[in-house]
Amino acid sequence: MKSVIKRLTILFWAVALCSSVTAQLKRYDTDFLLSRKNFVMTVPIEIERGQIYLSVRMQGRLYRFKLDTGASQGVIYDDVPVRGLRELGYIKSEDAAGQSRQVATVQLPPFALDSLIISGFKVQRMRRSVRREGEDGIIGFALFHRGIAAKINTRDSVMTLTDRRGYFRQAWGEALRYRLKWHVPYVNVSPFAGVTEEVLFDSGSPMLYAINNESLAKMQATVPSVSRQIEGTTYGSHAMGHFGSEHSNKITLLALDSLRWGGFTLQEVHCSTVQGGSHIGAPLLRYGNLIIDPFRKQLIFQPYDGRTSCVVANHRPDIIIVEKRGRAMIGMVTEGGKAWEAGFRHDYVIEKVNGQPLTFDQFNSYQWVRDQEYEFTLRLPIGIATTIRSIWPLQYNQK
């Protein structure tokens, strides 16, 4: 969540820091218990920035979790107070930017998702990469592949959950069989005619589609139509993980004629390359329902109104902001865009706005006034400072 910010991919092998931790990790598993059997229920979901949020009640308090199929288990942020966490030890976790850390694993107290009580759910305890009000953590794909099927309907802001194995057996739609890698779902989509690519379905990513640099290079070498759909290249970084941003690198900008999910075609898709894995993200759910059927290992896309195609015609952001050492940094700037013309360049660190020093979190929550001009104090990679006056909001994307 890759994105932009990616989902946490958990590598399930123990880090033996001491004998007590090792003993705990030998008992660590991803199973959890449900309070009901043979059920079908519909729960409300919230859609914010195109992503899905679930409200749960735990220890008498409401918590709000992002539903992230690119995460295997989930996360509870370390600044969120929760009584009754059970510490399980440490595992090694790798984020969207390819950086890894040892992170604490904890078991949440029982929590209620509508009328369903879930007990024994394990998550990682870690700091948040981007501060967002009203987001306490992440619920990952384990919610489904451990025995719950679901239908996500963002148009009506509801999600159907069931433990009945055959409930979605006769469901219509474009079904893709998924393969679990690192406990998250990968499917084959077609970004170019005659070519398929295995990608992560990552509902935690705000990008409709992102393609790995090396994957694109291999396709370009064998498929003539790929070069025609390249708009240009730039340099920078635009994926943020839980442990930091990816390193600056070449980014290829693409205007795809089509992106095919089975028999459904998304037309005029603007996207770009990433250093991490290729993925298809939350914006897919703007165009239809999605059924997650863990019993048949299928993701079934149901286009709204039964269509076989849609025109996306999405706009690429002029500028992308990432975090570096606690500050907001220009991760990528599209040459010729408004941000480029204003003087912003990749790897410039934003130190002040109107003379006020800002951390990354403060920049992220700054109360911008539309069409107002601001003075930005920037630190260049060579160490010198400069100032730029620009109207905000610039068009930027941040996970």
Predicted segments with their positions:
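Bacterial Sec-dependent N-terminal signal peptides
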Residues: M1-Y28
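Pepsin/retropepsin-fold aspartyl endopeptidases
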Residues: A23-K399
